[in-house]
């Protein structure tokens, strides 16, 4: 039976493709979700992609991941990365292997973006690869889970 992973996207990621394309590129959230589904399938995984502009909804999905025995998480918490102790605590609390991902290189941007509350709850963090960071995150998560690429 295929293992499920959640790909969670936070605030403003629904605007990918139109919001500051010089920073985030022209790819849309639909493009991200298609990339995630295809990448996960290549490892025999199922990617469930969700996006919310609400912190509490993201936390509820993290808790749901635990109750549904989801194998792993990929999270782009958007601006909540730099502000949300609650997301950090939820991730630590569920003890599910997690990869943090960001489309832009947060360290080449404003100083406030240089701190991540999510990073300490994740086994890996990726930034600056555009939406390809999601492919890299799922590939790394698959390796952590012991999932092999399917032919």
UniProtKB/Swiss-Prot annotation:
Coiled coil: none annotated. The keyword Amino-acid biosynthesis applies. Its EC number is 4.2.1.10. CDD domains: DHQase_II. It holds the Pfam family DHquinase_II. GO terms for molecular function: 3-dehydroquinate dehydratase activity. Substrate binds at residues 76, 82, 89, 103-104, 113. It catalyses: 3-dehydroquinate = 3-dehydroshikimate + H2O. Gene3D superfamilies: Dehydroquinase, class II (3.40.50.9100). InterPro entries: DHquinase_II (IPR001874), DHquinase_II_CS (IPR018509), DHquinase_II_sf (IPR036441). Keywords: Amino-acid biosynthesis, Aromatic amino acid biosynthesis, Lyase. One of its GO terms (biological process) is amino acid biosynthetic process. The record marks 19 as: Transition state stabilizer. The active site is at residues 24, 102. Pathway: Metabolic intermediate biosynthesis; chorismate biosynthesis; chorismate from D-erythrose 4-phosphate and phosphoenolpyruvate: step 3/7. Catalyzes a trans-dehydration via an enolate intermediate. Belongs to the type-II 3-dehydroquinase family. Homododecamer. This is 3-dehydroquinate dehydratase. The gene is aroQ.
């Amino acid at each position: 039976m295929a293992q499920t992973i959640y790909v969670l996207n936070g605030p403003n990621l629904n605007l990918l493709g139109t919001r500051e394309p010089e920073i985030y590129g022209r790819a849309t959230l639909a493009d991200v979700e298609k990339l995630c589904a295809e990448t996960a399938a290549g490892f025999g995984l199922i990617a469930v992609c969700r996006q919310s502009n609400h912190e509490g909804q993201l936390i509820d999905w993290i808790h749901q991941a635990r109750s549904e025995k989801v194998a792993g998480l990929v999270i782009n918490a958007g601006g909540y990365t730099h502000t949300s102790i609650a997301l950090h605590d939820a991730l630590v609390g569920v003890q599910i292997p997690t990869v943090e991902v960001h489309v832009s290189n947060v360290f080449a941007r404003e100083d406030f973006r240089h701190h991540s509350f999510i990073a300490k709850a994740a086994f890996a963090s990726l930034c600056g690869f555009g939406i390809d960071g999601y492919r890299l995150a799922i590939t790394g998560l698959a390796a952590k889970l012991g999932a092999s690429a399917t032919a």
